[in-house]
């Protein structure tokens, strides 16, 4: 593969912005499959709650890395990096341009910049931390993480106990801050990368997100969540749309409140996505409808 001869187009943006429709048009223009960069669409049990491409959309354009794993499977951004790069080797033998699309920031960075190899934690450290969490909750673990790795503490979702524990177990096992393993220099890639960002005004995006959640409920999100409810302890299910439904199934909130929380948490997630993406000066930003023609000219 020669850098100047092959291009990876990356279509990114917050949840609900309209990536799916435009991605189909771009992929048809390129004549190549779509690579999904969604860390939850990869799980076959979650098509509704992750807004995975429909069978009709997949018949129109083949999609890779959608529904390929079970929620029971361990999967990471590092594994995704390796597998996508292998897939691109094959795809670039047939196509000059390939589209990667999604909103999972770590997955996009994994392909475009690369991820450091992070050592496995000592099993006894992990066991001790999970025992502490079960006995005392997360406050003490958070305090220790803040002391040992203030950078990671500042950006981690402190309600996500698995991510908090993972950060601390790496600190304790290696004697280094977890954040020190995060790559600052991008790996070289043997292809061009063109990043296309989609945006909408905040009010417009929030309305679209709220409407999409209601549409998901009509499509059967509640039933989909019930089917995986016995597996709620899995990290793949610690995600917006499912954890709120699980609270409803537990009886701690009613159905209407669960829907409201999914809408609210989806809006919060969209804001976090935009904060992350805005750090990347290589992204060119477009409105998915008003600038559609301009975007399509970029891939010709």
UniProtKB/Swiss-Prot annotation:
Top EC category: transferase
Start and end residues of each stretch annotated as Interaction with substrate tRNA: 38-41
A GO BP entry: tRNA modification
Keyword flag ATP-binding: yes
Binding site for substrate: 15-20
Transmembrane residue ranges: none
Cofactor: Mg(2+)
GO molecular function, one term: tRNA dimethylallyltransferase activity
Binding site for ATP: 13-20
Residues of the site described as Interaction with substrate tRNA: 104, 126
SUPFAM superfamilies in the cross-refs: P-loop containing nucleoside triphosphate hydrolases
Pfam families, per the entry: IPPT (PF01715)
EC number: 2.5.1.75
Keyword Magnesium: yes
Catalysed reactions, as listed in the record: adenosine(37) in tRNA + dimethylallyl diphosphate = N(6)-dimethylallyladenosine(37) in tRNA + diphosphate
InterPro entries per the UniProt record, alphabetical: Dimethylallyltransferase, IPT, P-loop_NTPase
Keywords: ATP-binding, Magnesium, Nucleotide-binding, Transferase, tRNA processing
Family listed: Belongs to the IPP transferase family.
Subunit structure: Monomer.
Known function: Catalyzes the transfer of a dimethylallyl group onto the adenine at position 37 in tRNAs that read codons beginning with uridine, leading to the formation of N6-(dimethylallyl)adenosine (i(6)A).
Protein name from the UniProt record: tRNA dimethylallyltransferase 2
Natural source organism: Porphyromonas gingivalis (strain ATCC 33277 / DSM 20709 / CIP 103683 / JCM 12257 / NCTC 11834 / 2561)
């Amino acid at each position: 593969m020669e850098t100047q001869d092959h291009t990876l187009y990356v279509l990114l943006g917050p949840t609900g912005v309209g990536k799916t429709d435009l991605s189909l048009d771009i992929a048809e223009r390129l004549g190549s499959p779509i690579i999904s960069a969604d860390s939850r669409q990869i799980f076959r049990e979650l098509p509704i709650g992750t807004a995975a491409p429909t069978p009709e959309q997949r018949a129109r354009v083949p999609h890779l890395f959608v529904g390929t794993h079970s929620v029971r499977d361990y999967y990471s951004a590092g594994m995704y990096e390796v597998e996508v790069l292998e897939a691109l080797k094959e795809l670039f033998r047939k196509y000059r341009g390939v589209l990667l699309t999604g909103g999972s920031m770590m997955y996009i960075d994994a392909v475009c910049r690369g991820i450091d190899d992070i050592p496995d934690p000592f099993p006894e450290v992990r066991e001790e931390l999970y025992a502490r969490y079960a006995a005392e909750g997360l406050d003490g673990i958070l305090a220790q993480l803040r002391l040992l790795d203030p950078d990671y503490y500042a950006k981690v979702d402190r309600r996500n106990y698995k991510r908090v524990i993972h950060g601390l177990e790496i600190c304790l096992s290696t004697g280094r801050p977890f954040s020190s393993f995060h790559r600052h220099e991008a790996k070289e890639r043997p292809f061009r990368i063109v990043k296309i960002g989609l945006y909408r005004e905040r009010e417009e995006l929030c309305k679209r997100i709220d409407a999409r959640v209601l549409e998901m409920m009509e499509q059967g999100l509640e039933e989909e969540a019930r089917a995986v409810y016995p597996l709620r302890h899995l990290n793949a299910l610690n995600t917006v749309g499912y954890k709120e439904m699980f609270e409803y199934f537990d009886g701690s909130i009613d159905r209407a409140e669960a829907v409201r929380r999914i809408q609210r948490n989806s809006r919060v997630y969209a804001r976090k996505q935009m904060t992350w993406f805005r750090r990347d000066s290589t992204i060119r930003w477009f409105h998915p409808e008003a600038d559609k023609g301009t975007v399509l000219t970029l891939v010709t």
